[in-house]
């Protein structure tokens, strides 16, 4: 029983969010010299984690509206992550992966757009009555790739589709269970 360890639902959500955030941003521990070849695998891993933690996103707006302190901590944490991603993108500009002509404003807007699609894509698919499958994740990846490609120095470094790659960690269909997903 989580209520034994935490005094409120909000504390549970923040603890779960911290765990989710760590899993979502494991890529930042990967040497940036390995990217972008690993971007497709990172995206699939992120979609899987987001689906596993979908209950947080279904409760998040209600909890944030109800608790100003929780909202403050959540926004501060999210903004910190956005800054980490901004620094990462600037490194990609320095390494001639992203175009040097990108302004900070363009990078920030790209980050926000990719963030929104990455976080909410599977909810969009699920609420539309579709099954959460590798194909659904691939479509989310394709949307993100379409956003990023115009900013790449060499568009060929980012595959248009995961189907063209050997992504072995993603099953053809994810089985939806009460506790999350299984492959």
Where are the predicted features?
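Secondary-structure edge/capping motif, primarily at the C-terminal ends of alpha-helices
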Residues: 27-31, 57-64, 96, 121-129
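Hydrophobic alpha-helical connector segments
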Residues: 28-56, 76
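Helix-loop "lid/cap" segments that line or gate small-molecule binding pockets
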Residues: 44-51, 59-65, 146-151
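C-terminal peripheral helix-coil segments that are non-catalytic and often amphipathic
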Residues: 127-183
